[in-house]
């Protein structure tokens, strides 16, 4: 808890304790019927005299004051210990924020060392950039397959690779698993700069796999 939160809680407790009714043993006895008229006239003086008597407050007031003092003392000692109570994830996050260069370096090394496998990658291009001879301002999202298929190798693929390495299959060319599209996007329709209508089929990958 922050200091202001604790102070607010203490003020609420103090207000609650001051609002408690007086104990039964400390309530003033009721005046007889004939003296009520006189009691009404003396009421302002009685209230002023009672307000100056701290012994009429309930015993909980002293407990609340002790609690407030103990809480303030604890807060003065606690800032140095708050770091030890934080979870490990929070401490690591604070350390990374203090040393951004170190955290970036570790993240880059981790990405380089991790094998992504065969994944689908997207890039924003103009249809003219595809190199198919179209002159147009039409744009598209081109998706292609990239990555390694080493993790998808079967025992058959390993045997063929070993036989090729040992030159046991010299006369035959053995193909390896490649990361290629196994499904394609919908056809793309567009007009070129000469207002000629064209349709591109199987132009962009939709799903990838090792084949």
Swiss-Prot record:
Family affiliation: Belongs to the TGF-beta family. GDNF subfamily.
Glycan attachment positions: 126, 162
Subunit structure: Homodimer; disulfide-linked. Interacts with GFRA1 coreceptor and RET: forms a 2:2:2 ternary complex composed of GDNF ligand, GFRA1 and RET receptor. Interacts (via propeptide) with SORL1 (via N-terminal ectodomain); this interaction affects GDNF-regulated, but not constitutive secretion. Also interacts with SORL1 in complex with GFRA1; this interaction leads to GDNF endocytosis and lysosomal degradation.
Species name: Homo sapiens (Human)
Signal peptide: 1-19
PANTHER family on file: GDNF SUBFAMILY OF TGF-BETA FAMILY, GLIAL CELL LINE-DERIVED NEUROTROPHIC FACTOR
SS bond list: 118-179, 145-208, 149-210
TM annotation in the entry: none
Subcellular localization, as worded in the UniProt entry: Secreted
UniProt GO molecular function: chemoattractant activity involved in axon guidance; glial cell-derived neurotrophic factor receptor binding; growth factor activity; protein homodimerization activity; receptor tyrosine kinase binding; signaling receptor binding
Region Disordered, annotated ranges: 21-56, 78-113
Source organism, top-level taxon: Eukaryota
Protein name: Glial cell line-derived neurotrophic factor
Single biological process term from Gene Ontology: commissural neuron axon guidance
Keywords: Cleavage on pair of basic residues, Disease variant, Disulfide bond, Glycoprotein, Growth factor, Hirschsprung disease, Secreted, Signal
Tissues expressed in: In the brain, predominantly expressed in the striatum with highest levels in the caudate and lowest in the putamen. Isoform 2 is absent from most tissues except for low levels in intestine and kidney. Highest expression of isoform 3 is found in pancreatic islets. Isoform 5 is expressed at very low levels in putamen, nucleus accumbens, prefrontal cortex, amygdala, hypothalamus and intestine. Isoform 3 is up-regulated in the middle temporal gyrus of Alzheimer disease patients while isoform 2 shows no change.
Residues making up the propeptide: 20-75
Induction of the gene: By cAMP, 12-O-tetradecanoylphorbol-13-acetate (TPA) and FGF2.
Start-end of Basic and acidic residues biased regions: 27-38
Function: Neurotrophic factor that enhances survival and morphological differentiation of dopaminergic neurons and increases their high-affinity dopamine uptake. Acts by binding to its coreceptor, GFRA1, leading to autophosphorylation and activation of the RET receptor. Involved in the development of the neural crest.
Disease: Hirschsprung disease 3: A disorder of neural crest development characterized by absence of enteric ganglia along a variable length of the intestine. It is the most common cause of congenital intestinal obstruction. Early symptoms range from complete acute neonatal obstruction, characterized by vomiting, abdominal distention and failure to pass stool, to chronic constipation in the older child. Pheochromocytoma: A catecholamine-producing tumor of chromaffin tissue of the adrenal medulla or sympathetic paraganglia. The cardinal symptom, reflecting the increased secretion of epinephrine and norepinephrine, is hypertension, which may be persistent or intermittent.
Primary location recorded for the protein, binned into one broad class: secreted
One GO cellular component term noted in the UniProt record for this chain: Golgi apparatus
């Amino acid at each position: 808890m922050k200091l202001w939160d604790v102070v607010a809680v203490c003020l609420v407790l103090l207000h609650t304790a001051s609002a408690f009714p007086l104990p039964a043993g400390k309530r003033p006895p009721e005046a007889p019927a004939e003296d009520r008229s006189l009691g009404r006239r003396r009421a302002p003086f009685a209230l002023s005299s009672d307000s100056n008597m701290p012994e009429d407050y309930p015993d909980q007031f002293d407990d609340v004051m002790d609690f407030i003092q103990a809480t303030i003392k604890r807060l003065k000692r606690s800032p140095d210990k708050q770091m030890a109570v934080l979870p490990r994830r929070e401490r690591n996050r604070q350390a990374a924020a203090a040393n951004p260069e170190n955290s970036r370096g570790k993240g880059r090394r981790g990405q380089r060392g991790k094998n992504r496998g065969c994944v689908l990658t997207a890039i924003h291009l103009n249809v003219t950039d595809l190199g198919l001879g179209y002159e147009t301002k039409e744009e598209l999202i081109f998706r292609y397959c990239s990555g390694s298929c080493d993790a998808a190798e079967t025992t058959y693929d390993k045997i063929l690779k070993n036989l090729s390495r040992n030159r046991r299959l010299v006369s035959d060319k053995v193909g390896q698993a490649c990361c290629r599209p196994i499904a394609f996007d919908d056809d793309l329709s567009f007009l070129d700069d000469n207002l000629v209508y064209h349709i591109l089929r199987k132009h962009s990958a939709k799903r990838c796999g090792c084949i």
